[in-house]
């Protein structure tokens, strides 16, 4: 086996362990690239001197819980909660007693009669990829890891999803998420609105009807609906 092939095999094996086999088939080569090596080293160093969220075993949960071949919807977030509630899924909280304001507004838009668990794994298991564009953060410092290389990896993730033959619904809330719209082919439905944060939800997120639209879209194609 050539040195290049050996490196490629090692990168693929690391990817399988990190993001699961179906994602590794599309993103495995990223793990041999210098930016990913630098990113890994930076996070390792950061964890030695700072509290970093989410916990190491949760960083890639979006990939592990929603395999590539199961992705039907993508909801794009920014970075994890910096208060210890991050579980690796965008907008989700692992603390049952902590429902962030953005998530409260999401639940309100869905129309929940009663507040449900803030853990959104139930969505991820149905094919909703809850992907932050930055997968780690320092405690108490939002966007603190926004320039260490994560965006390159999540950009490659979006590119790989864009290549799917089966249309994927992309939900892009707010200006940050909408920057990625230009990289998504028109064959994929794209839903946009202001972010569900308390500062912008009343400017068009409320009443956007995205959750109903998604399920109507799946009904039209005889696909299973998402149980939001």
What are these regions (language model features)?
Residues 9-10, 14-27:
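Generic N-terminal amphipathic, Lys/Arg-enriched alpha-helix
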Residues 1-4, 8:
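A charge-rich, low-complexity, intrinsically flexible signal that marks solvent-exposed coils, linkers
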Residues 22, 29-172, 176-184, 188-192, ...:
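A polyanion-binding, active-site-adjacent surface
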């Amino acid at each position: 086996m050539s040195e290049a092939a050996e490196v490629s095999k090692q990168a693929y094996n690391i990817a399988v362990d990190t993001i699961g086999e179906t994602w590794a088939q599309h993103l495995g080569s990223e793990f041999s690239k210098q930016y990913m090596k630098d990113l890994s080293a930076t996070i390792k160093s950061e964890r030695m001197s700072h509290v970093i969220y989410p916990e190491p075993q949760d960083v890639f949960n979006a990939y592990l819980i929603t395999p590539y071949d199961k992705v039907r919807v993508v909801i794009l977030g920014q970075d994890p909660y910096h208060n210890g509630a991050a579980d690796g899924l965008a907008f989700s909280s692992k603390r049952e007693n902590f429902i962030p304001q953005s998530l409260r507004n999401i639940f309100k838009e869905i129309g929940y009669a009663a507040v449900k668990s803030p853990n959104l794994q139930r969505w991820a298991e149905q094919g909703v990829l809850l992907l932050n564009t930055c997968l780690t953060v320092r405690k108490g410092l939002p966007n603190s890891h926004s320039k260490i290389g994560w965006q390159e990896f999540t950009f490659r993730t979006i590119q790989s999803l864009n290549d799917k033959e089966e249309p994927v619904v992309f939900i892009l809330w707010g200006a940050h998420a909408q920057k990625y719209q230009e990289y998504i082919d028109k064959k994929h439905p794209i839903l946009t609105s202001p972010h569900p944060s308390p500062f912008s939800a009343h400017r068009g997120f409320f009443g956007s009807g995205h959750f109903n639209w998604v399920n109507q879209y799946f009904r039209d194609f005889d696909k299973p609906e998402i149980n939001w």
